Amino acid sequence: MMITLRKLPLAVAVAAGVMSAQAMAVDFHGYARSGIGWTGSGGEQQCFQATGAQSKYRLGNECETYAELKLGQEVWKEGDKSFYFDTNVAYSVNQQNDWESTDPAFREANVQGKNLIEWLPGSTIWAGKRFYQRHDVHMIDFYYWDISGPGAGIENIDLGFGKLSLAATRSTEAGGSYTFSSQNIYDEVKDTANDVFDVRLAGLQTNPDGVLELGVDYGRANTTDGYKLADGASKDGWMFTAEHTQSMLKGYNKFVVQYATDAMTTQGKGQARGSDGSSSFTEELSDGTKINYANKVINNNGNMWRILDHGAISLGDKWDLMYVGMYQNIDWDNNLGTEWWTVGVRPMYKWTPIMSTLLEVGYDNVKSQQTGDRNNQYKITLAQQWQAGDSIWSRPAIRIFATYAKWDEKWGYIKDGDNISRYAAATNSGISTNSRGDSDEWTFGAQMEIWW
C-alpha cells in the first residue's frame, strides 16, 4: 500500500503534464506545391496564360514553388466560449536552385473569439490579418470573392433564416495620393489606404440541398488629410454577389452572378483599386531643377459583369470531375476594358484508391475593348498521379505531367508617349506590343501538391 501511495504523486504529475500538453497543442496547417519541369524547345518549364486573362489552368502549368505555413492555437476556452490565435506565413520562389532566398509574406495574424456575445450565440468576432471567407475556383486558382487583409468583423450571426457576417478590411496602394502645389505638379506622394466594407447573408435555403449566399461590398480610397487623388483616379465602387451552391453527386455546383462598379472592377473580387491609377514622372530642366508631375493616366470608372459556374462531382466509383465556365465583361469609360470567357474540365480516372490519371482541357478567349481584337489559348495536360485517397480533392499528391498549349493573340499591353497603358494589334516582332502572337509549346515535368 505504501508503494502505491508513493506512485500516486508521480501519476498525478504525469497526467497533469499530458493534459497541459494537450491544452497547449499547436495546430499546424498549410499548403505547398513544388516541382521540376522542362520546355520542349529547351530550357526550364514555361507556363501559359492568355494575355488579358486573370487566371490560367493550373494542372501541369505552375512554374513556382509556393508554400503557406499556418500555426494556430485555441489559447482559451471556458464552456462554449473560446479564443483562437491564427497565423500564416507564405513563401514563393522560382524553383531554379537549391538555395533561393525570398522575403516571406506575413499573410495572417488574427484572433477569433467564439460565442463571446451572450445575445448572439454562435457568432464569432475577430480582428487582425485574415483570409476572410474566400471564394475561388481551384482548377484555375481564381479568387472571385476575396477581401482578405488586415481587418475586423463579426460573422455567423444566426438570424433564423440565414447567417449574417459583417467585416471591414484594407488594401493599400503605393503612390496613390499627392499633395499638389499647382494643377498637376505635386510635392509629395503617399500610399493610399483602400477600405472595404463587406456584408454577407449566407445559408439561405432555396431548394432541397441548395443554399444561397448574398453579399455587398463597398470599397473606397481613404486619403490622408492634405493629400488628394489625381484627377481621373477612381475613388470608390461597389460589388454585388449572389452565389447558389447545390450539393449533388457527392460534390457541389456553384452558380455565381457578380456586378461591380468603378474602383471595384479592376480586381473584381471585392478589393478596391484605382487610387494609384495616376502614375508620376519627373522632368529635369536645363538648370537642374526637377519638377514632379502626376499624370492623368488610367482610371477604372465603369462596370464589370461576371457569370460563373463551377463545381466538383463524382461520376461513379472510378470517375471524378472538376469543371468551370465563366463569362466576364469589364466595360471601362477609357475603353481599356476586356471581355473574357473561359471553359474547362478536369476528369480523373481512378485506377486504384491511390493512383489516378487526370486530363485537363481549358480554353480562354479575351477581347480588347479598345481594338475589338481577341486573344485565345487552349491548353491540354495529361497527368499520372499518386494521391492520399480516391477523391479528386485528395492530397498530398505526386504527379508527372505533359502539357501542350497553343495560342493566337491579336493584341497586347503597351504604353504610349504619355506613359498611358494602351492596346495595339499584335506584331510578329514583339517589339511594339507584349502580345505573344501565334504559336504553341509543350512542357513536361513532375510536381507535388499538398494541403493539410
From Swiss-Prot:
Residues annotated as transmembrane: 27-35, 65-78, 81-93, 105-115, 123-130, 149-159, 162-173, 192-205, 210-222, 235-248, 251-263, 301-315, 318-333, 337-351, 354-369, 373-388, 396-410, 437-451
Positions marked as site (Greasy slide, important in sugar transport): 31, 66, 99, 252, 393, 451
Subcellular location, record wording: Cell outer membrane
Primary localization class, coarse: membrane
InterPro entries associated with the record: G_neg_Bact_CarbUptk_Porin (IPR050286), Maltoporin (IPR023738), Porin_LamB (IPR003192), Porin_LamB_sf (IPR036998)
Induction: By maltose.
One GO biological process term: monoatomic ion transport
HAMAP family for the chain: LamB
Assembly information from the UniProt record: Homotrimer formed of three 18-stranded antiparallel beta-barrels, containing three independent channels.
PANTHER family in alphabetical order: CRYPTIC OUTER MEMBRANE PORIN BGLH-RELATED (PTHR38762:SF1)
The protein, known as: Maltoporin
Lineage: Bacteria, Pseudomonadati, Pseudomonadota, Gammaproteobacteria, Enterobacterales
